Amino acid sequence: MNELPPQIQNQLAQIQQVQQQAQALMQQKAQVEMLLRETERAFEELQKTEEGAEVYKGAGELLIKAKREDVLKDLEEKKDNFDVRLKSLSRQEERLQSRFNQLQEQLKSALGKMQGQGPATGGRAE
């Protein structure tokens, strides 16, 4: 058993690919969660201000004076967008987990069959 059969090598490669995708997805999800928390915090703080209070919003490296209500509306839209993105990432994460479990079961089955053949074949294809 010096070398794994191509089918098992392929399954291992697929599992590694799914693991890499899951890791990238987790990083994206963490970033979106952080942005959502920041946006929620800004929204909550802005709600505490009086109507008509001077408000500034960032535009690149600039701070621009804006209407409080407009900024609240913008923050609400951002929150909604981040929520949608987070739900989408969670669904992708579930699909990847399902795919990983499926590949893992296939690999276990293939390895079990390979071990079941034992050394009787001498590792040669006939």
Swiss-Prot record:
What are the recorded Gene Ontology BP terms? protein folding
By its UniProt entry, which CDD domains does this protein fall under? Prefoldin_beta_GimC (cd23162)
**Pfam families recorded for this chain?**
Prefoldin_2
Q: Which SUPFAM superfamilies match?
A: Prefoldin
Sorted alphabetically, the keyword list is: Chaperone, Cytoplasm
Major place of residence: cytoplasm
Signal peptide start-end:
none
Q: Out of the domains of life, which is the source?
A: Archaea
Q: Which GO terms describe its cellular component?
A: cytoplasm; prefoldin complex
What are the subcellular locations of this protein?
A: Cytoplasm
Entry function = Molecular chaperone capable of stabilizing a range of proteins. Seems to fulfill an ATP-independent, HSP70-like function in archaeal de novo protein folding.
Assembly: Heterohexamer of two alpha and four beta subunits.
Q: Which family does it belong to?
A: Belongs to the prefoldin subunit beta family.
- Full protein name: Prefoldin subunit beta
- Which organism is this entry from? Methanocella arvoryzae (strain DSM 22066 / NBRC 105507 / MRE50)
